[in-house]
């Protein structure tokens, strides 16, 4: 449960016991619940921030500490890729708590890249509409693609290509790839 910091600490402890040569992380867990600025609750905001921001921050720090503690060579394969959302560049008022948490994740990506270099590269991918939102019908899903500047949206294959690029581009850190 990523809203329970004790569970997150236990996850990190168990991981470090089993994987001393841990060098990479993709932060893909996420909570995506609808609310607006007029109706958000502190409980919903805290859940979004815990899952979409605080837990990834803890995991990134744990990975960095593992690299240093185990004197893992400062190679460019030590990396984090955060999955955020293209909403960070195309704000709209829906999914208020979710959007705030992804904006925080964007800042986390840049701050972590600065804080953990040169031992750890930290980048992010910000996909747009790839999958339908909960309760979104097929027609509305297809219409939403047309709101993109290219009149289409990213695909799962685009996401894989971005992951491959960031994984293998050893000179890139602090970058957010918008899809």
How would you label these PLM feature ranges?
Residues 1-4:
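Rossmann-fold cofactor-recognition segment
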Residues 155-179:
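C-terminal substrate-recognition "lid" of short-chain dehydrogenase/reductases
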Residues 28-34:
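Conserved NAD(P)H cofactor-binding loop of Rossmann-fold oxidoreductase domains
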Residues 72-117, 129-130:
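Catalytic loop of short-chain dehydrogenase/reductase
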Residues 124-149, 153, 158:
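A glycine/serine/threonine-rich, flexible loop-to-helix segment
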Residues 106, 116-130, 172-179:
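Conserved Rossmann-fold SDR core element
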Residues 36-37, 41-49, 144-145:
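Substrate-binding pocket helix/loop in short-chain dehydrogenase/reductase
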